[in-house]
Amino acid sequence: MKRTSKFLSLLLALAMVCSLFVPAMAAEGEEGIVVLYTNDIHCTSDDGLAYAAIASYKAQMEDTYGADNVTLVDNGDAIQGGILGSMSNGSWIIDIMNAVGYDLAIPGNHEFDFKMDTFLDIVENQAEFPYLSCNFVDADGNAVLDPYKIISY
């Protein structure tokens, strides 16, 4: 019994290892989707993975998967932490994010470093993409931003 059990265990382990070598392929006619995201960039504009690199990578993914199948998201803390953010209260970074082609963003705690009015002005008048948040409410408990966005691929 022990010998049979060991043999079956070994056979099962071998089958599991062999399954790692079978490539996963999309069904014919199906396209992949790509969700790219950034977070805690803190105004990075000249390091290795700066906005130019993000724009280039997004373009590569759009060439591969189609522009309608690629979504670029920022998960917060983009507009503060560097000279470009400090000199413009974050607005120059938003200009760069618009040029890169962000599809949506989530505010991080540092999006509020330049005061609430500044952030809301950026959201309402400058960003060409929506900011989303399900837990950002005003004094009366009303949502300030949309809580979600449905994207169809």
Regions flagged by a language model, labelled:
Residues 1-11:
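Bacterial N-terminal signal peptides that target proteins for export
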Residues 27-153:
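Acidic, metal/ion-coordinating pockets
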Residues 18-30:
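Sec-dependent signal peptide cleavage junction
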Residues 11-19:
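Bacterial N-terminal signal peptides
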